[in-house]
Amino acid sequence: MVFIGPNQIIKHEPEGEIHQPYGKALIFHSDLIKGTNLGKHIHEYTFFSYASYEALHLSNKEREKILVCFDNIENEIIQNIDRHSKKLILSNLELLLNYCTRFYDRQFITRENIGQGIIEQFEQHLNEYLRHEKLQEIGLPTVSFFADTLNLSPNYFGDLIKKETGKSAIEYIHLKLLEYAKEKIMDKTKSISEISYQLGFKYPQHFTRLFKQKVGVAPNEYRSPKVDCPT
């Protein structure tokens, strides 16, 4: 299954012989879910921002469950519309999306070796980013930067990191950044402001705020031998 969000375009480019793709498509306007419970939570279905090559691969049993939802929605549309129709369409649509969330979780687990390989590549790229002056050249590391580096969409990459590490991608990046920052802070020949610029922060106060929020003390306090600081 491939999911397409608003304003996204997908096209099929056949190779060699003419190939006509076939299957089912479910397309709905945002007005359908506006003001509903599904509308409030639609952003949680992050697979709408996945790239087409990050499609959901269904087992036969999973496919049957999805087709039941498709058929239920289709039957509600083709029969005479009554006051129950919209509610039943929405409940089946939400059920379909919840199934897809479950099946993507299964896919992440069954492809654990692939996921672990991506984590290892991410670690390598992140360490290189921190250690090879990219902080000053490019600025603070972002989720989209590493997703692009690994040829993944940001949402798919973020969901994969969350499944593998228990942390969001940005939390994981901040964790590694602050570990590197702790090393820098212990170099007392440089001021905290200098270090913050070296770490890619435009403003020293932003670094101080993040450090204190995550570590529990300000950078100057962490540097001081008089304070028993967390590690």
Which stretches of residues belong to each language-model region?
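C-terminal regulatory or interaction extensions
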Residues: 102-113
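N-terminal regulatory/effector-sensing and dimerization cores
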Residues: 1-51
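Append "Primarily bacterial transcriptional regulators
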Residues: 145-148, 152, 157, 161, ...
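Amphipathic alpha-helical segments enriched in hydrophobic/aromatic residues interleaved with Lys/Arg
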Residues: 48-94, 99-100
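…primarily DNA-binding HTH/wHTH and HhH modules…
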Residues: 208-231
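A short, Lys/Arg-enriched amphipathic alpha-helix from helix-turn-helix/homeodomain DNA-binding modules
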Residues: 112-150, 171-190
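Terminal helix-turn-helix DNA-binding modules in bacterial transcription factors
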Residues: 163-202, 224-231
